[in-house]
Amino acid sequence: MLTYTKIIGFELNIYVSTGPNTSEYKKILANEIYDQSLDCKIIEDISRSREVNAIIYSDDSEISDFALFPDSTVIFSTFAGVEKILLNKTISQPVVRLIDVEMTQCMAEWCAAHVLRYHLDLDSYIKPTKKEWNTSHKERLLADQVDIGVLGLGTLGSATARKLRKLDFNVAGWSANEKKISGVKSLVGPEGLTKILSSSDYLILLLPLTERTKTIINAESLKVVKDGAVLINAGRGGLIEDSDLLRALDSGKLSECTLDVFNEEPLPPEHPFWFHDKVTVTPHISAPTRLKSSIKSILANISRIKQGLQPIGLVEKKRSY
């Protein structure tokens, strides 16, 4: 277990580099440090990088060379996903990904909203092709007659699975290790993946992007997907082979999909996803970082470190999450 002996019992010097919102972030952080009477100080000048013990960092910030911070003991990401950070070869420090209650709630609500949108066939009423009063409808299944598969049962996936169970859907989850979630069937391994793909009316992707999960949704895996299933991806764009997904939609193998994450972001204006009538595109907004809540989560981890405890969300670099 990491103990971070350099900063236990000492004032912690923090450098903040969170992209366009760095100034706002530092103001909120300073207020929270004051309100919580924490023994921490924000280092404003990069020329004092050798004094820095901890870094709060976003992928879109201007910092790329972490060798500038030889005494930094930890890097806190402001995002849940860390695959981009881990590509940086100058990082030798432990990385802690963001685990935040409000972000988790946002993701669970977003996923549930899109499941309900399809389940209730709301698009046919919200976006009708003809402006007419049409009360005819196909009798829909009830929630307890619908099977949902959540791929990825980490913090976000587990919360989403619980939210959908509360709505009476039948929920199963697939992950690297078996998870115990009340009312949710936990599946693992290749057989578990085949089972969840073949039995789910809705597939929700909330996996981290690793060598094992890259393009996990491809031509081969789509062959076993239940005919007419709906796919919702709020994990990472790299989980999907785009061309194979489009073919599955064109053939009717998948009936619809909603995508919040993409292999290239922003999604290029000429990308086929924009023009496909079975694809809903949202611009990576399923679970945005909420400044005040995320800062409180990071400061709670800093308090843990100063007590000699391991931070929540410590990344295993070999696993990429």
Task: State each model region's role.
Residues 1-54:
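N-terminal glycine-/charge-rich "phosphate-binding" loop or analogous flexible N-terminal tail
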Residues 39-51, 63-65, 184-199:
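Short acidic low-complexity segments
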Residues 53-128:
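Phosphate/diphosphate ligand-binding glycine-rich loop within oxidoreductases
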Residues 65-71, 86-91, 222-227, 248-253, ...:
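Short, conserved loop/helix-junction motifs that constitute active-site signature segments
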